[in-house]
Amino acid sequence: MSILSALTSISNPMKSTKSSVANGGGRLSMGSNSVACGSCGGGNSSSGTINNADGSQTTYYSYTSPVYTYNYSYSYSSSGSSSCGCH
């Protein structure tokens, strides 16, 4: 599943999406995509990173109960998908 179809297939009335696709020196930028995923209980917080094809790292989600926020910026040679929920 592509990142775009993954985002558009999430049916959540709380989601807000801002996307822009541009070729900036061989990079595909999805801009700022955030999804409010609802409560997961607890009061925890965490974040995750991905390694980009150019060697940089991108924080792709942060979680502070009760909301997950996902942010995507992928190069052409990378792929990924998103999902809402408690991981």
From Swiss-Prot:
Pfam families: Coiled. GO terms for biological process: sorocarp development. It comes from the Eukaryota. InterPro entries: HssA/B-like_chaperone, HssA/B-related. Residues 1-22 have a biased composition (Polar residues). Residues 1-24 are annotated as: Disordered. Belongs to the hssA/B family. PANTHER family: HSSA/B-LIKE PROTEIN 1-RELATED-RELATED, HSSA_B-LIKE PROTEIN 1-RELATED. This is HssA/B-like protein 8. It comes from Dictyostelium discoideum. The lineage of its organism: Eukaryota, Amoebozoa, Evosea, Eumycetozoa, Dictyostelia.
